[in-house]
Amino acid sequence: MKLKLFLLSVLLLVSGSSQAQRIKDIANVQGVRSNQLIGYGLVVGLPGTGEKTTYTEQTFKTMLKNFGINLPDNLRPKIKNVAVVAVHAEMPAFIKPGQTLDVTVSSLGEAKSLRGGTLLQTFLKGVDGNVYAIAQGSMVVSGFSAEGLDGSKVIQNTPTVGRIPNGGIVERTVTTPFSTGDHLTFNLRRADFSTAKRLADAINELLGPGMARPLDAASVQVSAPRDVSQRVSFLATLENIQVEPASESAKVIVNSRTGTIVVGREVRLLPAAVTHGGLTVTIAEATQVSQPNPLAGGQTVVTADTTIDVAEEDSRMFLFNPGTTLDELVRAVNLVGAAPSDVLAILEALKMAGALHGELIII
């Protein structure tokens, strides 16, 4: 049986010339960033979907002790409506004390569901160990689970993860270098020497020579006013300057799992001839029983009956001329009706032969 060939769907990055973009769309201000917070807490009020692990009991006892209630060490509280959870949030830049954060709550143990639970006061710490926010409140859980007495179970989405909108209150700010020093630095989201130079040139054209200088392929340093009150308007002006990013390097990106192929507009091919055929080998094995004559005195044996079928597809050769564009490449590949796996093999062979001018990236 011959292999069925499917039409390859190729995504093409074929935009014409690069278009100018605002600095705020291609770069970030160094030091102006969000920070991750994490904490460990208890969710209570669960309808029998909690857990009874040792660390859950220890955490529960510690919480009661903080409220002045001391339980005997040998007492194991029977709790089914409590779960230990990890609480995490993203703390945006410039957020002030008293403002709120959305927090995500995830079960750490064997709780079946967090639906209907309430998170008790939990400290959210940064990487430096300091407390920056406090989270508490009722959770929104989109998933649910149900289990019958016979062991049957239905689970939709993820019932062990929930969110608390505005459930975290900021208690401390994170200092940034935005208001200190004599310079501001723009970091490109995609490092490129040409783009870094163009960004510096665009700023110097507006502010004057020497105001901006590229430090490397990803960073451009700009002289900034020392007066902090002027920096906001200064940066607001800079981030709206139009810059034309440099063209991307020639790349072919292949997702071997989904068969998606993205071809950059700068990809070119040198002269090459390609032929690709498929060989299908089918092996079928069945067992048969060999029964001897009743008077022969032999033994019954099981024998294997193996059938091997080999089928080879007819393949066609196609030729790439000098300077072949990606459009011609796609047409040629679609012409032979190659499947994604076949196209990947062709691209790898072209790269090994030195005929593919571009970086081949397989993800």
From Swiss-Prot:
Belongs to the FlgI family. Assembles around the rod to form the L-ring and probably protects the motor/basal body from shearing forces during rotation. It comes from the Bacteria. InterPro entries: Flag_FlgI. Keywords: Bacterial flagellum, Periplasm, Signal. Coiled coil: none annotated. One of its GO terms (biological process) is bacterial-type flagellum-dependent cell motility. GO terms for cellular component: bacterial-type flagellum basal body, distal rod, P ring; outer membrane-bounded periplasmic space. This is Flagellar P-ring protein. It comes from Shewanella woodyi (strain ATCC 51908 / MS32). The basal body constitutes a major portion of the flagellar organelle and consists of four rings (L,P,S, and M) mounted on a central rod.
